Swiss-Prot record:
It comes from the Bacteria. Induction: By amino acid starvation. Activation through the binding of uncharged tRNA in the acceptor sites of translating ribosomes. It comes from Streptomyces coelicolor (strain ATCC BAA-471 / A3(2) / M145). GO terms for molecular function: ATP binding; GTP binding; GTP diphosphokinase activity; kinase activity. The keyword Nucleotide-binding applies. Residues 149-246 form the HD domain. This is GTP pyrophosphokinase. In eubacteria ppGpp (guanosine 3'-diphosphate 5'-diphosphate) is a mediator of the stringent response that coordinates a variety of cellular activities in response to changes in nutritional abundance. This enzyme catalyzes the formation of pppGpp which is then hydrolyzed to form ppGpp. PppGpp could play an essential role in triggering antibiotic production under some nutritional conditions. Residues 503-564 form the TGS domain.
Length: 847
């Protein structure tokens, strides 16, 4: 591992010039990445020829090329002492005026100076040189937005500066895409900027080549850490890179946006959490949430904005009372409200199963103090005013979290009997909680600069130096141990399982590779994780050198070896299905047995469907040959109808359940039964009289006094394109032109009639709507009340709630004027928690 304190190797001016002499790419290139225009970075500079770019500041021994030569008057001896010092200062000032910093870098350099007021000018010049090299080699490259590509590395570096990262990391941020996207190589980089910057850029370049996704396994993580994260700053740069990409995602196609957002939510946000970088984590989560679930996101944003004024008023009262108590106790503290993050609110609704109001109305405040002693003193002061809620106190100072997060958590019954959450910690703890591992370099720079704002957990009288305090940071030592323990990936993965769930175990293969398995996994799960054939042929196992039964439970760090059979007929046992834990093993075992009897299972499944349909007098032939079953199979994620039949035959899905779904797709039991008549050829001489007071609002062109009815499968309303179909004994059934049943009906074109809308005051139409909302108590009651207020007659209502606390409701009601439907939908959308509402029809999906 390179020493972080190692000074940067400054390249000589002629070396940088030699680098500039290399031919830069001539043709403009549009990178296929997630980059769009930056939001917080300055505009890209105007391109300059290499020879016009500012020169690095000359060494003290050099005379600047354009600096004035100060000479003593003739006949007088040269003055010394203060006069010479004044002249030298003026000469240096002339150099600075002659070589100002690139104005594009001023916002970045302002942040850098704020982090370290005593930073040397030579270091700032090195950062400027890194920008010059990056701008030169990215010249001509464009982002998806059309902006110069250099705007991206500049924005990434600004994020790194805001985190307080050191100059080497800032230079690596500016140069992080040069090696991958240009002809500027690692040797050029090492010559111009030294080993540390080269190591960081190389690590980020390799990290970019790791492909994450559904197939990402624990060994991929191990390789990433061993080969690419020899220095933790590599991961910090990558997080800043991903954050800027997420901020500028709008120029990509929707499909790619969702892919990147899902990857961010599953990998990068948890990685930031593991590194303790909560500010990055929260923003990544909210950005990904907005892309993946835009309607839910918008609804939570609306709810937050709606409740913010009242919540802020209550928060001000609580904050003021806490400040008064702490002031009376002579505890110097900063008391602020804790922000609520949209994805965090959504997650709490899912995990805790609570309504939005419960979560958002729970006020949280943060108390920051100087020392650990003050933390506990502040806790006592708060508990003296308000009663604590039993079981809600947590001491993360004495027992830090896995990422060394430290704080005191408590919940009290505040003013008005409302619960209030408090976090009490020192300023240093807060910086680590916000910036995580990045806080190490910020702390280090402040310590070196002797900044007065640096606070320590120990009293000033303790006599400890700043270096001692750095050594006391157990959280930092634990995280930096990655670099020393890469040969032991199991231990690393225990502290950095960012892309896998918590309920897992990590075991080793005989070759030292890491396999991630569900908690409670067995050697059989391990065998199938290695390879399907290894799993099928497994006959025994050895764990940590000891023979064990195949159903034994594996623990973290176990070394697992399995024995396989070479016999031609070797295969899995059905008994394994009783103890395997991984979906992969279970699916592979079932697939092995399913292969032998798939045809048999398909026939059994089809027979089961037919029997279930007969019980409900459904049109078997039409449904089995139509699109309804195909659509249902795809919705249930089966590749085709045969796969659905096989699943039914093998007992994975029940036939009555499938038939019920089909009936719902056709518009309900009545509509499905109605279709039986439509599938039978018409016979003359039979008919029914039209029902009185039931004007459908449709007439058949060229035909009078014929019974017309609106199909319940697609519930057409005036304005919808429609067709008529002659049924036996039921007159003409009117369907939407895009109804899923039209394809099967059109096989008999002689029975298709032209119809048109002619609604009257007595016409009544069926409308079905679907309401999607964040689940809460009284949701159904509130929606039905709004529908009643809109004077619609509700005929049926059904509600389902998913695991992620999304309530999906379907209402069928009668309306006299479908033009009023827009007002109805708008009113329902105004119900708290509702983020989408739309009319439901059985329209065919666009091909």
């Amino acid at each position: 591992m390179p020493d972080e304190a190692q000074p940067l190797t400054a390249a000589k001016p002629e070396s940088a010039s030699a680098s500039a002499a290399k031919p830069a790419p001539s043709a403009p290139q549009a990178k296929n990445d997630t980059h769009g225009p930056i939001q917080h970075a300055p505009a890209a500079p105007v391109d300059k020829p290499a020879e016009q770019q500012p020169r690095p500041k000359p060494l003290p021994a050099e005379r600047p090329q354009n600096a004035p030569v100060v000479r003593a008057p003739a006949g007088q001896p040269a003055r010394s002492g203060s006069s010479n010092r004044v002249r030298a200062r003026l000469a240096r000032l002339g150099v600075q005026r002659a070589n100002p910093y690139n104005p594009v870098l001023e916002p970045l350099l302002r942040i850098v100076r704020g982090n370290d007021p005593k930073i040397e000018t030579s270091t700032l010049r090195q950062i400027e040189r890194a920008y010059q090299v990056a701008e030169r080699w990215h010249r001509g490259q464009k982002r998806k937005s059309g902006d110069p590509y250099i705007t991206h590395p500049l924005a990434v570096t600004t994020i790194l500066a805001e985190l307080g990262m050191d100059p080497a990391t800032l230079m690596a941020g500016l140069l992080h895409d040069t090696v991958e996207d240009t002809e500027y190589g690692l040797e050029d980089l090492r010559r111009d900027f030294g080993d540390v910057v080269t190591l960081l850029v190389d690590g980020v370049t390799k990290l970019d080549k790791v492909k994450f996704g559904e197939a990402a396994q624990a060994e991929t993580v191990r390789k990433m850490v061993v080969a690419m994260a020899k220095d933790p700053r590599v991961l910090v740069i990558k997080l800043a890179d991903r954050l800027h990409n997420m901020r500028t995602m709008r120029y990509l196609k929707r499909e790619k946006q969702e892919k990147k957002a899902r990857e961010t939510l599953e990998i990068y946000a948890p990685l930031a959490h593991r590194l303790g970088m909560n500010t990055i984590k929260w923003e990544l989560e909210d950005l990904a949430f907005a892309i993946l679930y835009p309607k839910m996101y918008d609804e939570i944003v609306r709810l937050v904005a709606e409740r913010a004024p009242k919540r802020d008023e209550y928060l001000a009262v609580v904050t003021d009372e806490v400040q008064q108590d702490l002031r009376a106790a002579r505890i110097k503290a900063t008391v602020t409200g804790r922000p609520k993050h949209y994805y965090s609110v959504y997650q709490k609704m899912i995990v805790r199963g609570r309504d939005f109001a419960e979560i958002y109305d729970l006020v949280g405040i943060r108390v920051l103090v100087d020392t650990v002693r003050d933390c506990y003193a502040a806790l006592g002061t708060v508990h003296a005013r308000w009663n604590p809620v039993p079981g809600r106190f947590k001491d993360y100072i004495a027992m830090p979290k896995f990422n060394m997060y430290q704080s005191l958590h408590t919940t009290v019954i505040g003013p008005g009997g409302k619960p209030v959450e408090l976090q009490i910690r020192t300023f240093d703890m807060h910086r680590r909680a916000e910036y995580g591992i990045a806080a190490h370099w910020k702390y280090k720079q402040e310590a070196v600069a002797g900044a007065s704002k640096v606070r320590t957990d120990a009293p000033k009288s303790s006599g400890k130096s700043k270096d001692d305090h750095l050594n006391d940071m157990a959280w930092l030592r634990q995280l930096l141990d990655w670099q020393k323990e890469t040969e032991d990936p199991g231990e690393f993965l225990e502290s950095l399982r960012f892309d896998l769930s918590r309920n897992e175990v990590f075991v080793f293969t005989p070759k030292g590779d890491v396999i991630a398995l569900p908690a409670g996994a067995t050697p059989v799960d391990f065998a199938y994780a290695v390879h399907t054939e290894v799993g099928h042929r497994t006959i025994g196992a050895r764990v940590n050198g000891r023979l064990v039964p195949l159903e034994s439970t594996l623990d973290n760090g176990d070394l697992v070896e399995v024995f396989t059979s070479k016999a031609a007929g070797a295969g899995p046992s059905r008994d394994w299905l009783g103890f395997v834990k991984s979906p992969r093993a279970r699916n592979k075992i079932r697939a092995w047995f399913s292969k032998e009897r798939r045809d048999e299972a398909i026939e059994q499944g089809k027979d089961a469907i037919v029997r279930a349909m007969r019980k409900q007098n459904l049109p078997i032939q039409r449904i089995l040959t139509g699109d309804s079953l195909v659509t249902l199979a795809h919705e249930m994620r089966y590749s085709d109808i045969s796969a659905l039949y096989a699943a039914i035959g093998e007992g994975h899905v029940s036939a009555p359940n499938i038939v019920q779904k089909l009936v719902q797709a056709l518009g309900g039991e009545e509509a499905a039964t109605e279709e039986i008549d439509e599938s039978v050829p018409p016979s003359r001489g039979r008919g029914r009289k039209r029902r009185a007071n039931a004007d459908p609002g449709v007439v058949v062109k060229g035909v009078e006094d014929v019974w017309v009815k609106l199909a319940r499968c697609c519930t057409p309303v005036p304005g919808d394109p429609i067709i008529g179909f002659v049924t036996r004994g039921s007159g003409v059934s009117v369907h939407r032109s895009d109804c899923v049943n039209v394809d099967s009906l059109s096989r008999e074109p002689e029975r298709i009639l032209e119809v048109e809308w002619a609604p009257t005051q007595s016409s009544v139409f069926l409308v079905a709507i679907q309401v999607e909302a964040l689940d809460r108590s009284r949701l159904l009651s509130d929606v039905t009340r709004v529908l009643s207020d809109q004077h619609v007659n509700i005929l049926s209502a059904a509600v389902q709630t998913s695991r992620d606390r999304v309530a999906t409701s379907r209402f069928t009601f009668e309306m006299g004027d479908p033009k009023h439907l827009g007002h109805v939908l708008k009113a329902v959308r105004g119900v708290e928690g509702v983020y989408d509402v739309y009319r439901v029809t059985s329209a065919r999906r666009p091909s």
